[in-house]
Amino acid sequence: MVYSSGSWRDAYKGMSSDNVKGLVLALSSSIFIGASFIVKKKGLKKAGASGLRAGSGGYSYLLEPLWWIGMITMIVGEIANFAAYAFAPAILVTPLGALSIIISASLAHIILQEKLHTFGILGCALCIVGSVTIVLHAPQEQDIVSVLEVWNLATEPAFLFYAAAVVGAAIVLIVQFIPLYGQSHVMVYIGVCSLIGSLSVMSVKALGIALKLTFSGTNQLGYPQTWVFTVIVLFCVITQMNYLNKALDTFNTAVVSPIYYVMFTSLTILASVIMFKDWDRQSGTQIMTELCGFVTILSGTFLLHTTTDMVDGESKGNLSSEEDSHLLLRIPKHSEDSNGFVQDGIILSLRRQESAKSPRPARQNKQLEDDLEAVPLRRQESSLRS
């Protein structure tokens, strides 16, 4: 496809004033939301120490002031995010959540001692590059003069089909998969958050447009569609927060944040393209550049996820001597504890710090070998008695 110089300049004529306002609001939103992840995680840990953890179905965190501070911080960020959607298209606003990933991963490394690998830092850089690429090629916000226009877009067959598919998938995850895999697979909780979140963003954008028009002198509060969007926003946000709390309480923050960002952003962009037809106002070059930027973000989040697993593996296998490695190879790994391996009721602690500081005495090694050799004999005696 060939473009004239005039059409090329039109395609890259720069950001409108509304897009700039949306950009500033989205950046400030990411800062607040990224910090709120850490504050809420601290509150969840503190509440879980004295009550039933959120990941196990408990709600003791509702009585924890630190969790509420994190929640208020997140609400401030969400308000800024809400306002950003009223001024700019979702394709511009949503990818800037990459900044919240960087903030939450960095603070988790500093405050929560959740180690961030060197390649994780590279992943953060890729997230920034991808976000900047998308921002520079984002579509201009279309001119909407009434909430009825948004309602007409939301009730077109294509978006109704998408909404039905999202709700159906979320119900299947909640009913079938969460009871079985919620505590072991991070994608289950985050899947519910992301699916419902894509609908909440579309409703938030509709409500934001209605309020913006109302404040500018064109009252939209008299339309029932405005209140329908309000109810949808409330329902979706409550659902998102519930399952996001479970994900944060169950899994590492440095893992939850990037995966949630990728899924949420992908589904939100898809919903925006279907409902608001953002790509209809762009050239093929711009669309491909946006997709390349998004793939760059995906690469960054993949690095963050992968290097977190590498750090966990290093911390669990960090033994100082060849004898330690030899002994561990002789232990059938039936189940794994957070600090060691469990075999026939005997917990063999790795004691990473002690082994790193000084070698184990020969007498201690001999005693450990004797204990290991005695395990099969104990099992035989137990079977004979039974």
Curated annotation (Swiss-Prot):
Its main location: membrane. Keywords: Cell membrane, Endosome, Ion transport, Magnesium, Membrane, Transmembrane, Transmembrane helix, Transport. GO terms for cellular component: early endosome; plasma membrane. The chain crosses the membrane at residues 19-39, 62-82, 83-103, 116-136, 158-178, 190-210, 221-241, 256-276, 284-304. Residues 352-386 are annotated as: Disordered. Residues 40-61, 104-115, 179-189, 242-255, 305-386 are cytoplasmic. The keyword Ion transport applies. GO terms for biological process: magnesium ion transport. Residues 1-18, 137-157, 211-220, 277-283 are extracellular. Acts as a Mg(2+) transporter. Can also transport other divalent cations such as Fe(2+), Sr(2+), Ba(2+), Mn(2+) and Co(2+) but to a much less extent than Mg(2+). Homodimer. Belongs to the NIPA (TC 2.A.7) family. This is Probable magnesium transporter NIPA5. The lineage of its organism: Eukaryota, Viridiplantae, Streptophyta, Embryophyta, Tracheophyta.
